[in-house]
Every structure is written in C-alpha cells, then in structure tokens.
Amino acid sequence: MSDKTPRKPTAFRLEQPARVSAASEQEEPRRPRAVKDLEQITPQADVFDLTDDEAAELEILDPAFEAPERKGWSLSRILFGALGILVSFAIGIWTEDLIRALFARADWLGWTALGVAMVALAAFAAIILRELVALRRLASVQHLRKDAADAAERDDMAAARKAVDALRTIAAGIPETAKGRQLLDSLTDDIIDGRDLIRLAETEILRPLDREARTLVLNASKRVSIVTAISPRALVDIGYVIFESARLIRRLSQLYGGRPGTFGFIKLARRVIAHLAVTGTIAMGDSVIQQLVGHGLASRLSAKLGEGVVNGLMTARIGIAAMDVVRPFPFNAEKRPGIGDFIGDLARLNSDRNARK
C-alpha cells in the first residue's frame, strides 16, 4: 500500500471550448498598409551557370562574322581549272572513239551509244546549271548581308528597302516567315528610317528562323555529346562529329533559304571552317575548361562524359559559325547566339546520364 493520503473528492468546473460561428470564421479584409518586412527568397546558384568573366571570355571566342573579300585567280584555281579542261578533253575523245568503234561494228550499236552520250551530256549540263544557280544564290545571300549592314550603318532608307525586298524574295518559300512578310507588306507606304526598317525586317522575318536554328544547333550538339559518351573508339567520335557538322551546315543553309548544291555546300563548308580558323575556333578558355572538368563538375562528369561535352560544344561552335555565314542579315536587332547558350544544356545532359549510371 502507498503511504500517501488519498485525495478527497472535490468538484471542479470544465471550461467549454468557445464556439466559433461561421460568420466569425470569415476574416475581415485587411486595411491597406505599407509592408516593410518582406520574405526574401534567395535562389540557389546553378553550378552550370557561367560567371561574368567566363561569359565575356566566350563572347571573345565568338566574334561576329565578316564576309571575306573576293580574291583574284590563285595558282590553285588555275591548276585545277587546267586539269579540269584536260580531263574534259580526255573524256570527249574517249567517247568519240567508243562511238566510232561501235558504228564500225554495227550501226544500231553506234546510234545507241550516241543517244546515251547525248542523254549523259544533257544530264551533266542540267547538273552544272543547277550548281551554278545554287552558287549564285549563295553569293546573293553574302552580298545581301553586306548591303544590309551598310544600309543600317548609313541609315539609308532606299538601300534598306532594297535589302528588305531581297530578303522577302529569299524568304518567300519559307512558311515560318509568312506573318512577318505580311506585316512588312502592310508597311510598304509608311516612312521608316533605314536602320529601323532593317531591324524590323530582322525581327519579324528572321526571328522565327533564328529560334529554329538554335534548336537545330542544340539538338546536333546533344547528339554528338551522347554518341561521344557511349562510343568505344575515338575514330567513331571524329566520324560522327564530321557527319553531324556537315548535316547541320546544310540544314541551316536550307532553313535560311540558301539551298546549296554539292559545290555550293563545299564552298559553304570552307567558309565556315575559315570563319572558325580566324576566330580562334575550337580552343576554349582556361576558366571554361576548369568549369567543365574541374571543381564542382568533377564529381558529376566522368572523363568520357567530359569529352562528350567538349565535342558537343565544338559542334555548337560550328553551328554558330554556320549561322553567321548563311544568315541573310547580320545580327543587329536580335542577339547573336554564343557558346554560353548551349554549355549549360550540354553539361546538364551529361550529368543526368552520369547520375542515372
């Protein structure tokens, strides 16, 4: 038994909980007053974002494109031109001897060979004509780019209207530019400064194409990055980078209305490579390399995935250079894309693959 004395029975009152009416549940509207203590939300820093110094360094690596000056006849052009003429003579003499020999054997064989030779000659002439038209179209885009830049610099309304009319002609077969062309058609009789007209045409006609071009460059860079990360041989990486870059150059040229042929594509690829060589190209700054393979990303990217990011950035550089070459107007009203626009997506893509592993 317990030594404590049991408590005597006592009566006490229970407090009833206050009943809240439905009317009192509705809060009265707060009177307007100044609020000084606001809750501050500090966003977390993204490890893939570039610092100001790194972004400036990337901008230096991506200068704007300037069309090269036309050069005269070089020794290499004279050599290949002379060799081409000699090969044409050799093929003509061989074809003539073949047709004569077939006529000597049987007339129907000779006439058949002559007909086949005529068909081949007509097809060859059509191919040459198509290539010449494509080269002329590519040259007209380059001249239009220079004329638009000159008109915007001098604020020449007549030259600007001429350049805008040429741009509308090039973009006539592109469905994405229909709305912009209609807007410019409605402003035909309006008085607009030359510089503003160039900027307006660039915004209304080329902005949808720039958006799609960025998507093409980003997707090509992602494909190169993924293939590099999973390919077993370096030769496969190089081959796929060349294939994807060539396809990207052709697709960008077709997007902006260039439609290059075989020789036009070769000339266009040479211009892109020359642009890359002049601008310091594939090289990247030390701070960007440190961000890709060192510090916070070292724990996220393996060596193979790091190579994928670098190859993807190289493809993006080629795509940006191709945009500079094939775009009818220089970047003025619209922001020119840079490596910084793609580096974050490529790094996130490869870090996600590494995390899934």
UniProtKB/Swiss-Prot annotation:
Residues 1-36 are annotated as: Disordered. Pfam families: DUF697 (PF05128). One of its GO terms (cellular component) is plasma membrane. InterPro entries: DUF697, UPF0283. The chain crosses the membrane at residues 78-98, 109-129. It is a multi-pass membrane protein. It is found in: Cell inner membrane. Residues 27-36 have a biased composition (Basic and acidic residues). Coiled coil: none annotated. PANTHER family: UPF0283 MEMBRANE PROTEIN YCJF (PTHR39342:SF1). This is UPF0283 membrane protein BCAN_A1047.
